[in-house]
Amino acid sequence: MAKPSTLDGYRDECTLDCERVLVTLLRGLGPWKDSVYLVGGLTPRYLVPARPPVVPAHAGTLDVDIVIDLQILADTEAYHTLEENLKRMGFERAENEQGVQLSWRWQTRTEHGALMVLELLADAPQIAGGRVQPLPTEGTISALNIPHSSIVFDLYQVAEIRAELLGGNGVATERVKHADIVSFTCLKAFAFDQRFERKDAHDLVYCIEHAPEGLDTVVAAFARALAGKHAAVVREALDILRRRFADEEATEAYRKDGPVAVAKFELGEGDDAGQREARVLRQRQASDLIDRLLSGIG
């Protein structure tokens, strides 16, 4: 499913609907909700709680990405609970471009016709190695293997989210485990490196740039993570940030594909002089931010 390549392709209403999808899903999962972790484009809403005009608007999202513990797929009761909950919410399996039904991507439409997409992700190196690919299943539900996504099981925060349940079933509040600034930045760095989607660059820069307590707290969080069990994964992600966003002898940082992706996503691709100048300024801001992050981490 192709995503918009610029910020103006996203709408606040879709983000709010995605929040409803998440809360509705968790409301019906019972004890298994503790094995579900939010990643992806809805996460910045909780990492950066400030809203315009205090901070610039984040793009939002068109889908809900959750990492699930493999135990949910392995445990018969948990599997059927998830399956029944998806069907009760009106979800059905999405199709790829060839018309083949996917076991890890599900979709439904809200009351006003907006298409909502839920993607189930997991980290199963013993099954799929380091490849991004669907995990095998004998049923209708599986997950897409996303290498390193299990770091969110340790590097997460909790937010209380209130939303109107799908189907007109009232307002509910759920505690949502979501990626913290370190795991979110790492997973977005891996995603940008692999698929080169502009929004991944926007997401990671936005959350670092507008971290509630400033860049120093982000640096401190990375320092703690580098002293923990996921140090190797974090270092790999930082190497990607260095390669995609930071200065080196051969190329000025602002000209690299990371800052350019941020600027084109946020400001569009217009070719008049004013827009080109605005993009270059934004590129410099993005590259400077990542340079300061990397310098602070050391």
Q: What role is predicted for each listed range?
A:
Residues 1-298:
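Compositionally biased terminal segments of proteins
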